[in-house]
Design a protein with these regions (language model features):
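Active-site- and interface-proximal helix/loop "cap" or "latch" segments in soluble metabolic
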Residues: 2-220
């Protein structure tokens, strides 16, 4: 999981990229599934705060996230993310870590961009982090990775005052599973991340100075 919470002037965004992975006996990626959640927050000069009502992930939104119409490939987000996941399959975590991207987070590799032109830097980093945290929990050869990324509804009536800032916290729950050819769950792990943006009385939105870690990463 890679989470960023940042603000600029009166606009802020929380972005969480997540990956579920299966590693084979040689430590190479046997399966990868990706998802991403983006939540935009804005502030007004009066201190009022606007938060999104739709808190679904990109994969969950499906055609409601209309990337295909704007894509030169005519592919939606899930199609491109799955292409990237397939591109990573068979590689080691170290090989994934070395995948180069440009200043916009996009790859220049011809094989990859033939089916995926979206920025992949956060997904690459999420896969690397997932590999670093991977544990033997019961998955077997041939099992597939699945991923669920769910955010709780955000408050719709927040406002900052001269005496008190407004805090927008996203409670994001993640579950990574492996399933066998019969659709049975063979392993599972859950996690949670709680990134937060702060809105001041003049509407300025700011993010935390420190990196955002999940509950599992924070440990005890």
């Amino acid at each position: 999981v890679v989470t960023e919470a940042a603000g600029s002037d009166r606009a802020g965004k929380i972005t969480t990229a997540a990956a579920a992975v299966v590693l084979d006996a040689d430590g190479k990626l046997a399966d990868v599934m990706l998802d991403e959640l983006e939540l935009s927050v804005s502030g007004e000069s009066t201190g009022s705060v606007t938060t999104p009502e739709d808190v679904r992930s990109k994969r969950t939104k499906g055609e409601d996230y209309p990337l295909a119409a704007a894509s030169s490939l005519g592919k939606g987000w899930a199609e491109q993310a799955d292409w990237f996941a397939d591109y990573l399959t068979g590689r080691t975590p170290d090989e994934v870590k070395k995948l180069k991207t440009d200043e916009n987070g996009k790859s220049q590799d011809a094989d990859l961009v033939s089916g995926c032109t979206i920025a992949v830097d956060r997904y690459r980093d999420a896969v690397v982090r997932a590999c670093e945290q991977a544990k033997a929990l019961g998955a077997a050869q041939g099992d597939r990775a699945t991923l669920s990324l769910i955010a709780a509804d955000l408050p719709q009536d927040l406002a900052a005052t001269d005496d008190q800032d407004a805090h927008v916290q996203a409670d994001i729950t993640l579950a990574a599973l492996t399933v066998d050819s019969n659709g049975r769950v063979t392993s599972a792990i859950g996690d949670m991340t709680q990134p937060q943006l702060t809105v001041s009385a003049d509407g300025t939105v700011s993010g935390p100075e420190e990196p955002v870690y999940t509950k599992n990463e924070q440990g005890d």
